[in-house]
Amino acid sequence: MSKFWLLLLLVAAFQFAHSYPAAEYELDETTNDEVRQFIGDGYFEDEGDDGDEERFKIKPGKVLDKFGKIVGKVLKQLKKVSAVAKVAMKKGAALLKKMGVKISPLKCEEKTCKSCVIFKIPTENSFCLTIRFMKTNIATYLVVAGEINRKSKFEEKLKLGNMPRCVNVEGFIGKVCMKGIEGHAKSSSGQANVNFCLGLVAEKFGVGAKLCGIYANKKVRVKISPQLFPGATSLDGDIVKLDDNGEDATTLDVDEVEID
């Protein structure tokens, strides 16, 4: 069952539960702590200590509200893809499983980073990317230069948050789609920084990559290693990755991180 239908069933179940008054439950101390840790204290009404057990009411309205936000986020991430794209992603999954594609660590100096994707079939070829972070008063960009086997092929300026831009690259790799994704990172002192990723997919191989960095103190740092994934483009042109269930396609996001 896909995540979409599973979520619909869960929504229906919570709406059914929401139609009843707040229910009272008696939990032993261990279960009580586990439930509170998972959902949060704000979703309960304590009614005193009965000695060995604590009684409280679950607030279904708050639980449903929290669940609705989670469902909305997941549904927003789900994307429709063509049958051809789904086949390509499954092909990419098989290729990655056989270690036919690898990616090197992202190495950065000041505002510029570089990494290479190595394709080992049918013969070994390298697709290297140089990513330069550029921030202006208007917007934030990633200037991406691509080269195949040490030969320069393209340079694109990607605004963070925009839809992907695709280029037909000469050589073995073919069409490549790229997008800049923006998140946020806070330092331990609370200072706001830019947390970003470059997402790309080589449609011919059904393989994508996500390379992330943090811009802070006028230079880029790396906290998360580059990732490869089975990927394609959705019907609306976004970059998507194959979900763990092997059926759904989801958008790329930026992992929230905290820096020193």
Swiss-Prot record:
Gene Ontology biological process terms in this record: cytolysis in another organism; defense response to bacterium; hemolysis in another organism; monoatomic ion transport; pore formation in membrane of another organism
Keyword vocabulary terms for this entry: Antibiotic, Antimicrobial, Cytolysis, Hemolysis, Ion transport, Membrane, Secreted, Signal, Target cell membrane, Target membrane, Transmembrane, Transport
Record flagged with keyword Oxidoreductase: no
Signal peptide per UniProt: 1-19
Keyword set includes Protein biosynthesis: no
Subcellular location: Secreted; Target cell membrane
Propeptide: 20-55
Gene Ontology CC terms, in alphabetical order: extracellular region; membrane; other organism cell membrane
Tissue: Expressed in salivary glands.
Function: Pore-forming protein that induces lysis of T.cruzi trypomastigotes, bacteria E.coli and human red blood cells. The parasite lysis is much more important than the hemolysis, probably due to difference in membrane composition. Its action on protozoan parasites and bacteria may indicate a role in the control of microorganism growth in the salivary glands.
Record family assignment: Belongs to the redulysin-like family.
Additional note from the record: Has an amphipathic alpha-helical structure with positive charges on one side and hydrophobic amino acids on the opposite side.
Protein name (database record): Trialysin
Organism the protein comes from: Triatoma infestans (Assassin bug)
